[in-house]
Amino acid sequence: MNSSNLFYSNANSTLRLSYGNVKDYIPSDAIHYDYYTTIAGIIEKEDSTNEDFIVPKKLIDLYNDKNFGRYADSDGNLRVNFIDNNDITGGNSGSPVLNAHGELVGTAFDGNWEAMSGDIVYEQGLQRCISVDIRYILFIIDKYADAGYLIDEMTTVSYTHLTLPTSNDV
């Protein structure tokens, strides 16, 4: 180690700010990823023989009952994740994602594989930040964990007012 040298710190313990837009992702010809996923995708990938894809029965039941409550989008779907072109790095997992009005719309948790060079150079066409939609987080707290009392303790913005992620809105 060169203890006498100064190095830029990781995302830990420093204030970082990134901005971007919610966007679909088209990494190559004939491959297109929509800017959001829904709970239907979780159910479609369910595989009881693969530890990474086991879906708890209670979540399957909530899906089958379409018991999404106020967390459903205008089409009645429950969005789980969205992608945007924010510039993130290792250590950003859990960082808040705000919309243009300063409202919490999700939490960043990963980047896409094709943008692994993002720690060295930002590539707008490739770089995507994967975030958990705040509606899914609140749904899990309220409906899955039966901890609605925690939601009651929060000051939340009405979903009729909240500007939720759509293309060009983060």
Locate the predicted segments by residue.
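Serine endopeptidase catalytic core focused on the charge-relay Asp
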Residues: M1-G91, L98-S158
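Conserved small/polar residues in nucleotide/adenosyl-binding loops
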Residues: T160-T166
